[in-house]
Amino acid sequence: WQDLNFQTVELKQVIRQKNPEFIHELNKARIGDYSCVHYFNTHCQKTLFENGIILTATNRKAEQINHDRLSKIPYKAKVYHSRIVGDVKNSDKPTLDELHLKIGARVMVLMNDTEQNLYQNGSFGKVYKLEDESVTVILDTNKTLVTFGYHEWAIENYVLSKRKEEDIEDNHLSKEKVGAFYQIPLKLAYAITMHKSQGQTYDQVNLIPYS
């Protein structure tokens, strides 16, 4: 590890925020300076933003909120069950085995559109139509209707093997497909974890930092 001589780079330019006072307090939080707490406590409100996304500390809390919000939609839920092939552990699963959806439910996309770039992993929308093998969503960003069928997530393990080239033998690390997980690439998105929200920009945020 030491022989690799990695170079450390510190990013100092803030792109997502413009308010210098807000940036200053965020930097305090980043380094663990407790004096920032007063600023945040005096610049927040206790009433939830009606259209703001809820960020939680744990998946369990997010799932609880999503279940509660889904139950308030006056339509019958449709359940999509995952399909598993090969060796797939619970920790390998990118989403739920049972996906409960209703017309009008808020959802997040869990894959990238590599062909038309209409959506990315993390895009939001609302359920427009439910069918046996697919779900149609109207996207927030461009109001486009997109139909999502079952998507395959390949489950891979790393394998260490010997490789010999020109009389030199060394170890070679490669990927090996051991299974596949199939599910509709959507999840309820009234609430998501802070981890899942990284890299996203939101107009309004409701923060629940406890589990």
What are these regions (language model features)?
Residues W1-S211:
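Conserved ATP-binding/catalytic motifs of P-loop helicase motor domains
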